[in-house]
């Protein structure tokens, strides 16, 4: 006899860094959200972007007149917001194309600024704090080496996450 085990994913996090692979991961997350939403009501889909402050070209430090590097950081925030808006647009389009009259996906955007270059940890910590049921992440991000099977961020998330992780290549 085989037992069927159904998993309820009511809160799904997708890590988005603007790379082609992260947008592909968004499509997978949206598809899962639609399927689970059809089975069990609405699903919250969280698009999360982590800005690694150590990767800014200019140093970011406090001065008497404000923060040096603030302009570059603001540009990164705008770029991150554009990525999240693109993912949200995909979710809305998919939700509208669904045959049901029910809006199954509630999309939420989050941007985290990471001061210590621990992007994987920032994703895992956020997922745990928000009680996420599933994390969807691309194999490699914008800076990943082509020959690596799994990037360092994805590897950290897979290793330390409290919940299931779907890695998309």
Write out the residue ranges for each language-model feature.
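Structural beta-alpha unit
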Residues: 1-3, 7, 89-135
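Short, solvent-exposed amphipathic alpha-helices that sit
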Residues: 28, 78-90, 122
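Small/aliphatic-rich secondary-structure junction motif
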Residues: 4-69, 98-100
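A short acidic, glycine-rich active-site loop
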Residues: 66-82
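General small-molecule cofactor/ligand-binding pocket signal
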Residues: 46-48, 108-112, 166
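Active-site-adjacent beta-strand anchor residues
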Residues: 15-16, 112, 138
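Gly/Ser-rich helix-loop-strand patches that form or flank binding pockets
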Residues: 1-4, 8, 126-169
């Amino acid at each position: 006899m085989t037992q069927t085990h159904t998993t309820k994913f009511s809160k799904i996090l997708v890590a988005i860094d603007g790379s082609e692979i992260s947008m592909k991961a968004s499509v997978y997350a949206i598809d899962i959200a639609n399927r689970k939403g059809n089975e069990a009501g609405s699903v919250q889909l969280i698009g999360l972007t982590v800005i690694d402050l150590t990767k800014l070209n200019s140093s970011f430090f406090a001065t008497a007149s404000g923060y040096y590097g603030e302009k570059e950081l603001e540009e990164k925030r705008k770029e991150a917001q554009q990525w999240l808006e693109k993912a949200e647009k995909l979710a809305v389009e998919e939700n509208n194309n669904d045959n049901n009259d029910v809006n199954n996906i509630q999309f939420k955007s989050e941007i985290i600024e990471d001061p210590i270059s621990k992007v994987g940890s920032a994703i895992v910590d956020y997922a745990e704090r928000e009680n996420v049921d599933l994390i969807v992440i691309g194999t490699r991000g914008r800076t990943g080496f082509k020959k690596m099977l799994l990037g360092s961020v994805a590897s950290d998330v897979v290793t330390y996450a409290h919940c299931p992780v779907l890695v998309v290549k």
